[in-house]
């Protein structure tokens, strides 16, 4: 069975940034407020399914979305500009590939790949003289997991997630370099009530926040960082 999908996406963005410290070089002391803006894009996708074996493969494309942000800048050592030029921003296009298939009775294997074109995202307020606040590598994420229905009431899943790292020298505004994660979750149903809980452990890749300038060097050393997240949801059907 083959199906297609499409739709309009609305995206709202606002931001504020303050740069302080030697890692920013001459830009230390700079600050900017970006007022909210709503932009519109689209998504297109297609899916192929074989329900008898719980097979589903889907590909979805998300378009770029353009924004124009009213901007107030200040520093270093200067008064705020109440009516600075607007800052253009384009958020990245992306592609998702998702799949699942039955491998045994009440057991699924699932996974996905996501790519986002973050290397094309540039935020260039006027006072920075054409320099971008962002310098992000393209984003690649791989997910692979197994889900199983243990009874009519309880099902569970475990999955691994990998995000590719890039250059060890990273922006101080995003001081990670790839990551690896493990997620375990389960769902328990009681008549019309569905209880879902999960826990995630993520290990971040080592990175070196860099100084500003034409020849950046490491200004710090971030190693052995991790995070734990816990989620819980209650659903009621009627």
Q: Can you describe what each PLM-predicted range is?
A:
Residues 1-238:
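Outer-membrane beta-barrel porins/channels
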């Amino acid at each position: 069975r083959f199906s297609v999908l499409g739709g309009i996406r609305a995206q709202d963005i606002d931001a504020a940034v303050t740069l302080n410290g030697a890692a920013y070089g001459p830009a230390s002391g700079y600050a900017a407020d970006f007022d909210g803006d709503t932009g519109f894009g689209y998504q297109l996708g297609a899916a192929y399914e074989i329900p008898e074996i719980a097979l589903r493969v889907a590909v979805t494309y998300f378009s770029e979305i353009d924004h124009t942000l009213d901007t107030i800048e200040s520093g270093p050592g200067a008064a705020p500009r109440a009516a600075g030029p607007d800052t253009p921003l384009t958020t990245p296009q992306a592609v998702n590939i998702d799949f699942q298939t039955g491998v045994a009775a009440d057991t699924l294997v699932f996974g996905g790949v996501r790519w986002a074109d973050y290397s094309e995202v540039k935020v260039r307020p006027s006072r920075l003289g054409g320099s971008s606040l962002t310098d992000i590598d393209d984003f690649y994420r791989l997910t692979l997991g197994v889900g199983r229905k243990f009874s009519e009431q309880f099902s569970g899943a475990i999955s691994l997630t990998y995000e590719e790292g890039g250059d060890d020298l990273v922006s101080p505004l995003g001081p990670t370099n790839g990551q690896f994660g493990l997620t375990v979750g389960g769902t328990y149903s009681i008549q019309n009530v569905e209880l879902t809980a999960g826990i995630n452990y993520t290990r971040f890749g080592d990175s070196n926040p860099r100084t500003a300038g034409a020849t950046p060097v490491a200004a710090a050393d971030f190693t052995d960082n991790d995070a734990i997240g816990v989620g819980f949801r209650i659903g009621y059907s009627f």
